[in-house]
Design a protein with these regions (language model features):
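Short, acidic/polar
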Residues: 9-21, 64-71, 108-119, 156-160
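Glycine-rich phosphate-binding active-site loops on the catalytic face of alpha/beta enzymes
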Residues: 30, 130-136, 152-184
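Alpha-helix-loop-beta-strand connector modules within alpha/beta enzyme cores
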Residues: 39-58, 74-76, 86, 90-102, ...
Length: 184
């Protein structure tokens, strides 16, 4: 599985990657990169003993399906995948690569479907978005068969603390300074 790190930053540019590599953090989520650049991103991270979770739906120039997942895992050697697509989660698991199922909670129906998908797919983790739904997912946090993550709309360390104290295992943030400022 992934290294222990409560707050995982999302890295979207080479400049942000360079800043990330100056921190002691061991893992990040890569998104918004073009497929041609993603291999370099992963190589740079691995050279510095960092792990990369690839958000497959937000990689430019790649189909975000099971074949795209297979390419990222087998040829680019991503350490984990994050996706809202069941076929991608299944492909990651088939390749013994950690899989994070991203769920967007828009209403009670999407919450119910997300819980059902989590039970069926058995991902290594499930990430709920936006993070503000954490009071609604409290029952699932206790009974989830995997780690429960939250992401989206996280503005400060106080919000991270609220989430982790409610049972959320990990939090994803788009602001690297939040990841480096968090002290458990």
């Amino acid at each position: 599985m992934l290294p222990s790190q409560t707050v995982i930053p999302v890295i979207t540019t080479m400049k942000a990657l360079e800043r990330f590599l100056e921190t002691p953090l061991p893992v990040f989520i890569a998104q918004d990169f073009h497929l041609n650049l993603l291999g370099n991103v992963i190589e740079m991270a691995h050279a510095r003993h960092r792990q990369v979770i690839v958000h497959i739906e937000l990689i430019q120039g790649l189909a975000s399906d099971e074949f795209g997942a297979q390419h990222i895992i087998q040829h680019l050697h991503a350490d984990a995948l994050i996706s809202s697509k069941p076929k991608v989660i299944e492909m990651a698991k088939k390749n013994k690569t950690p899989a994070i199922l991203r769920l967007f909670v828009l209403d009670s129906k999407s919450l119910k479907r997300g819980i059902e998908l989590t039970q069926t797919l058995k991902p290594d983790a499930v990430e709920f978005m936006p993070s503000l739904v954490y009071p609604l997912i409290a029952p699932m946090i206790q009974s989830a068969p995997c780690e429960v993550w939250a992401g989206g709309l996280i503005r400060d360390v106080a919000m991270i603390l609220t989430l982790t104290q409610s049972g959320i295992t990990r939090v994803t943030v788009s602001d690297l300074s939040l990841a480096t400022a968090y002290q458990p």
